[in-house]
Amino acid sequence: VTWHDGQISRVDRERLLGQRGAVVWFTGLSGSGKSTVAVAVEARLLGARRLCYRVDGDNLRHGLNKNLGFSPDDRAENVRRTGEVCRILADTGVIVLASLVSPFRAERERVRQMHAEANLPFMEVFVDVPLEVAESRDPKGLYRKARAGEIKDFTGVHQPYEAPTACELTLPAATQSVDACALQVVQMLRDRHIV
């Protein structure tokens, strides 16, 4: 299969939008605040008249990734598919805010490489909270179900979460407010001339 280029380039779309397409990839334990921070960043960007779109790992499991479970292979495929969706959206000039556990360092690195090959900015943001904090929040009751044996292969309970070693930003979400975390992400986008 051969790639088919159109007449309109990414530069044309970015010029039209007045921003650069990019991906902000929020990673962390379930209950760390990834989606909550992404929602706050989205509100700030849209308030500043910047086009962005949230790609939430849970939401994708209702459609595109509906057929995937939580085994290591399925998690890897979940991250790969999500990365492809983010790459396509970023190529349109949109700022993509992706939030998913993505527990394995190697899979996140593959997504980073995918964006590098497409010459698209990719920023990994680690929403860092201790397991005890994430488990005490448990907004979806997933830790409770995992501890009761109702969910297998759950990150933090049955499988490890591999924290980033070279991410662009670490948010200490156990000690900082959602708003403070969102401000740091927006500032990172400004510093990198995305917005």
Set out the residue ranges of the language-model regions:
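ATP-dependent NMP and nucleoside kinases share a basic, alpha-helical "lid"
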Residues: 63-74, 84-146, 153
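Conserved lysine of the Walker
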Residues: 34
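Small-molecule kinase domains that catalyze NTP-dependent phosphoryl transfer to phosphate-bearing small molecules
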Residues: 128-131, 136-184, 191-195
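Hydrophobic anchor at the beta1->P-loop junction of P-loop NTPases
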Residues: 26
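Conserved substrate/cofactor phosphate-moiety recognition/catalytic segment
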Residues: 39-87, 91
